[in-house]
Amino acid sequence: MSNNTRMDGLPAQPNLRVTIIAADGLYKRDVFRFPDPFAVATINGEQTKTTQVSKRTLNPYWNESFDFRVNEDSILAIQVFDQKKFKKKDQGFLGVINIRIGDVIDLVPDADDQMLTRDLKKSNDNLVVHGKLIINLSTNLSTPNRTQQTPSASRPSLLAPQTSTPNGTTDRPSSAMSSAVSTNGTPAASQPMPLAHRPASLASTTSTSQATAAATTSTTTATANGTPVQPRQVDVRQLSPFEDALGRLPPGWERREDHLGRTYYVDHNTRTTSWNRPTGTGQSDAEATQQAQRQQHQNRSLPEDRTGANSPTLQQQQAVAQAQATALVHTGATTAGTGELPPGWEMRWTPEGRPYFVDHNTRTTTWVDPRRQQYIRMYGGNNPNGIIQQQPVSQLGPLPSGWEMRLTNTARVYFVDHNTKTTTWDDPRLPSSLDQNVPQYKRDFRRKLIYFRSQPAMRILSGQCHIKVRRSHIFEDAFAEISRQSATDLKKRLMIKFDGEDGLDYGGLSREFFFLLSHEMFNPFYCLFEYSAHDNYTLQINPHSGINPEHLNYFKFIGRVVGLAIFHRRFLDAFFITAFYKMILGKPVTLADMEGVDADFHRSLQWMLDNDISGGIIEATFSTEDERFGVITVEDLKPNGRNIEVTNENKREYVELMVKWRIQKRVEEQFKAFKEGFNELIPQDLINVFDERELELLIGGIAEIDVDDWKKHTDYRGYTESDEVIQFFWQTVRSWDSEQKSRLLQFTTGTSRIPVNGFKDLQGSDGPRRFTIERAGDINNLPKAHTCFNRLDLPPYKTLEQLQQKLTMAVEETMGFGQE
């Protein structure tokens, strides 16, 4: 063998130690199962070693070392396979890296260790691969080669013959690089090896103590003759949760991973989380971000509430009306500056002192002074800018049949429709602010809102509900205050007081309260909610919230808070997956809803429905695996489901059961508690008048959208910004009001939420993803949205009118998102 070694130009003894540490973000090639990855390391296609198998993971951690004989021209190839599929045609290939040794390390005894992170590459089969591989190269072989062994781990059985040298290296006669590397490759030593460096994106969030213990690499070991030796300190070490590859985190910050392996940062000082690594100016940055979020939150509104940019608030209107009514009662005078009554009119007073007006021309009476002008705002149609117009009430004529005009106790006029038993602030004689040119959904949503808020169950009761909280402990204080009060008390006028702050709540304090509380309640820090796979700001219930033994009480409290915000016409700064809104409305979830939960899984299920799966293409049963805190259990989707195979005949039932389990069944207890609290304030029959997209707007409000910012951060495929159809598109968007823009944003991205820093921070299912308009489809087709990628497929319409018609119809009529 030594002669062959000299001919190959390789040393007689191993001179390089390769530590295969981990892989991150492997591709999930199987539809319903995670792979069992293992790695195969090869030098020039001759010396081959194999790691243990990591079970059911896309982020395997091996930390195994192997010694090789190399020179500067040697090529190190490390391939990753799925052990479940190793005997199949593609061998479960998950990626490969190729490294020329001389390019990365000097082959001298005192050379520094090299920690490498390389992207996995495709093979000749051109199969899709994802992820990175982390390895360490060292020329110091003075310490025994110790490979980590665990009882649950196993090595894959590779079928080709091999010859093992005494040091465990496998020599193969063929020098060709094979995608099917063949070895058993058991290393000579089997003592546990201290953990090497593990990158931030692979660190476990639940094993801090283990990581701390593993970081100690200077333990004393013994040689074969019993002489104690002190191994050299390894230059690379296990990163603690309080640092990452860029160094130490600021005081009070911790690095964690979510259920999808995405790294995020926890600020224990403020009990907040962030996707961005904190900097030295983190505190000022956090304050600036929160202030921007607060401003954005306070600018949200609903159609019924918007009567002009500078319109007074409801409290201001009531205060002015009350003052005017008081002046009329005490002085008997009319409104200042109104002049003489029109011919044929007379002002009289009721026994209580309230003025009313008699029109002798028509022999009718009214509470409204005919000299006053009624201001209305026209939406849509020929008045897109919402210009305020004036029209004398005296020229409107009598009310329609079945209608009655009344006054509130603050002298505000409203109208009763006895035909439908509803009330409205809008005078039915005035031109409707929702004329026939306005989309049907807008007319419906506003009328639904009027109906919803006019019902007896939604009226604020007499009295006051006092809630006192500390800003620094708003979650705990609000939980105690809201939980102790009855639903009846919570329906009284809300009076919020912040500890140590003097102020009267005329709406501003309660808006601030719901803003701050929503940031705390839905913070993943508390493990009650988690970010969806769709992006990093839409929320879903955390199926593992049971780690908190009081989690059901908290979910009932959160349900109360959401109901409280709707009841008192306040907004929460939180947005959920579409399926969550459908669950509140009692609607069944469908496969389309899975896209907002897990886009890859949605595509897998859709592929199953669209293709023939006979012949064992998919090895699945009516069961699924569920991992809770490291323990994997098998859950049946139906009785004895683990013994029922999925076929072409029953695959539709399987998909329905799988969707229901992924979205509903896993969080059934939590959602039941949420609904219990929610329905204490909001009756189910009333909330059911809305659909899921309207419910999102009802809870979160409608934001003012900066079209210039939207346009600035838009990409084009097949179009340029100067193309006529693109000009038509932005012209149409600018002509729409805030609600229509929010609907378009919902249609194209899946949510009406705008990132705090604007459209430049828009997220997709795979990270930051700018809004994109792509040229696709025939001009007779409607535009199509891909919500996971924030993409709009826009046909090249010839005229502005055609684009407006098609885009409006697509936004109005589409019931689900991402119809691909």
Curated annotation (Swiss-Prot):
GO CC terms: cytoplasm
EC number of the protein:
2.3.2.26
Q: Where is the active site?
A: 788
Q: What class of enzyme is it?
A: transferase
Enumerate the PROSITE patterns for this protein: C2, HECT, WW_DOMAIN_1, WW_DOMAIN_2
Q: Where in the cell is it found?
A: Cytoplasm
Its BP terms in the Gene Ontology are:
intracellular transport; protein ubiquitination; ubiquitin-dependent protein catabolic process
Report the GO molecular function annotations. ubiquitin protein ligase activity
| Ranges of compositional bias, category Low complexity | 200-224, 313-326
Stored InterPro entries: C2_dom, C2_domain_sf, E3_ub_ligase_SMURF1, E3_ubiq-protein_ligase, HECT_dom, Hect_E3_ubiquitin_ligase, WW_dom, WW_dom_sf
- Organism superkingdom: Eukaryota
Tell me where it mainly resides: cytoplasm
Q: Which reaction does it catalyse?
A: S-ubiquitinyl-[E2 ubiquitin-conjugating enzyme]-L-cysteine + [acceptor protein]-L-lysine = [E2 ubiquitin-conjugating enzyme]-L-cysteine + N(6)-ubiquitinyl-[acceptor protein]-L-lysine
Region Disordered: start-end pairs: 140-255, 270-326
Pathways per UniProt: Protein modification; protein ubiquitination
Question: SMART domains, from UniProt?
Answer: C2, HECTc, WW
Domain C2 residues, every copy: 1-118
- Quaternary structure and interacting proteins, as annotated: Interacts with creD.
Protein purpose: E3 ubiquitin-protein ligase which accepts ubiquitin from an E2 ubiquitin-conjugating enzyme in the form of a thioester and then directly transfers the ubiquitin to targeted substrates.
- Protein name (database record): E3 ubiquitin-protein ligase RSP5
Q: What is the organism field in this record?
A: Chaetomium thermophilum (strain DSM 1495 / CBS 144.50 / IMI 039719) (Thermochaetoides thermophila)
> Which gene carries the instructions for this protein?
RSP5
